[in-house]
């Protein structure tokens, strides 16, 4: 970077001739026209190259409720034109007005347009800082805001005497805020379309005392106390007071989200006080809200076989004493069942161990009996009678051969027996013949 600075401090014609091959040959695009006219030091070549790589402006946000204040016409009117006769003249701005204008300048399209370099702008001529892709946009935005604030202060000084002291209800900027709100009401979405349920009953102004309001006073007090004790802040009223400055679109969206979430909590916490009011005052039962009671039941009903993931973490304080006792008894029963479940696995483990032990004993007995039978078979075979280390396969083979040989000897002996029987029969018959001949 120091090389570029020293390089730019030399003669401009020689420098441009030396770095001319680095630029595009385009006659329509002249980077240094403004510098040549004003006879200022030219920027480094990298400065204009980074212009081609600047990021596009961010997408626009939701339409602000004060769209009139964001427009350049309103800014010019508010800063340079005098107010009406009722305001006391002068374009003076309070601290809230300046902060609001700064926030809208930072979030609006004027700053986004400032990121794109305009060669006819004064800031392009005076900008001698070597730009960087990270810091050039922020410096331009800060410079634009400071220039706008300086113009506002100059307009305030030139406008004349400051406006007289304003009371809490006579702020002209607040009247302009309300006028802008009414003018931009067509651009905004009706909250009743997004939130069909009543958002905040406690924020509405309380009417005169009536029997209906007296009947529901405990529930409203309990709602207020629960809203104050809740970790989240209570929802702000929708009606803007005169001294409250209008919020931006992002703030309004966050307030709507908080109001929606707190509305769900208030519907859940509204059920026990309503029951108490119905049981305590039977006369007010006819004036109870019929459309809201089924809604509360539908939103608070949770099936027993499902887990309510959207429920608050601790719901024990919402239940009465009877339900607490039932919950405690149910927890005790669950603990007992869990203990039984814990005991039953132990008993099943012992049973499995006993079965395994008896199986091992029976298997050992079977192996011992099989070994004894093999030893007995080995003793019956003449070839393996004295061989104590004979394997079982050899014992089985030798036993099979010995049995076959024994069966063959048996058949031979049976045939010899038959021959001897026949011989005996023949000899007996011959002896009988000799006895008969001698007689």
Curated annotation (Swiss-Prot):
Instruction: Show the InterPro entries listed in the entry.
Output: bHLH_dom, HLH_DNA-bd_sf, Myc-LZ, Myc_transcription_factors, Tscrpt_reg_Myc, Tscrpt_reg_Myc_N
Cross-link Glycyl lysine isopeptide (Lys-Gly) (interchain with G-Cter in SUMO2) lies at 52, 143, 148, 298
Motif 9aaTAD, chain ranges: 100-108
Domain (bHLH): give its ranges.
Answer: 354-406
- Glycosylation positions in this chain: 58
User: GO CC terms for this protein?
Assistant: cytoplasm; nucleolus; nucleoplasm; nucleus
What role does this protein play? Transcription factor that binds DNA in a non-specific manner, yet also specifically recognizes the core sequence 5'-CAC[GA]TG-3'. Activates the transcription of growth-related genes. Binds to the VEGFA promoter, promoting VEGFA production and subsequent sprouting angiogenesis. Regulator of somatic reprogramming, controls self-renewal of embryonic stem cells. Functions with TAF6L to activate target gene expression through RNA polymerase II pause release.
This chain's protein is named Myc proto-oncogene protein
Q: What is the organism field in this record? A: Felis catus (Cat)
High-level lineage: Eukaryota, Metazoa, Chordata, Craniata, Vertebrata
């Amino acid at each position: 970077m120091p090389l570029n600075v020293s390089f730019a401090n030399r003669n401009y014609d020689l420098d441009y001739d030396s770095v001319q091959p680095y630029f595009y040959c385009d006659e329509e695009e002249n980077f240094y026209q403004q510098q040549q006219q004003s006879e200022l030091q030219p920027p480094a070549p990298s400065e204009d190259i980074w212009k081609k790589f600047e990021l596009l402006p961010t997408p626009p946000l939701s339409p602000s409720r004060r769209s009139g204040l964001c427009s350049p016409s309103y800014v010019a009117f508010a800063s340079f034109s005098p107010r009406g006769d009722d305001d006391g003249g002068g374009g003076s701005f309070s601290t809230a007005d300046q902060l609001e204008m700064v926030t809208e300048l930072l979030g609006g399209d004027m700053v986004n347009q400032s990121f794109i370099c305009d060669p006819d702008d004064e800031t392009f001529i005076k900008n001698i800082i070597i730009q960087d892709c990270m810091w050039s946009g922020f410096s331009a935005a800060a410079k634009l805001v400071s220039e706008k604030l300086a113009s506002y202060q100059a307009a305030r000084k030139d406008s004349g005497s400051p406006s007289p002291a304003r009371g809490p209800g006579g702020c002209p900027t607040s009247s302009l805020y309300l006028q802008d709100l009414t003018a931009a009401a067509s651009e905004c979405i009706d909250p009743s379309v997004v939130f069909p349920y009543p958002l905040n009953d406690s924020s509405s102004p309380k009417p005169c005392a009536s029997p209906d309001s007296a009947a529901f006073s405990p529930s409203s007090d309990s709602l207020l106390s629960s809203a104050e004790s809740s970790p989240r802040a209570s929802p702000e009223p929708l009606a803007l007071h005169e001294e409250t400055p209008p919020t931006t679109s992002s703030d309004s969206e966050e307030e709507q989200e908080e109001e929606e979430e707190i509305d769900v909590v208030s519907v859940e916490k509204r059920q026990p006080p309503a029951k108490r009011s119905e049981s305590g005052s039977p006369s007010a039962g006819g004036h109870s809200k019929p459309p809201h009671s089924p809604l509360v039941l539908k939103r608070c009903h949770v099936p027993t076989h499902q887990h309510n993931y959207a429920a608050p973490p601790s719901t024990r304080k919402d239940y009465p004493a009877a339900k607490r006792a039932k919950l405690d008894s149910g927890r005790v029963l669950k603990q007992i069942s869990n203990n039984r479940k814990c005991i039953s696995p132990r008993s099943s483990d012992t049973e499995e161990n006993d079965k395994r032990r008896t199986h091992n004993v029976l298997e050992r007995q079977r192996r011992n009996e099989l070994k004894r039978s093999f030893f007995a078979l080995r003793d019956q075979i003449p070839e393996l009678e004295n061989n104590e280390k004979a394997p079982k396969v050899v014992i089985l083979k030798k036993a099979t051969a010995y049995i076959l040989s024994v069966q063959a000897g048996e058949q031979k002996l049976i045939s010899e027996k038959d021959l001897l029987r026949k011989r005996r029969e023949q000899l007996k018959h011959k002896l009988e013949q000799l006895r008969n001949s001698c007689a």
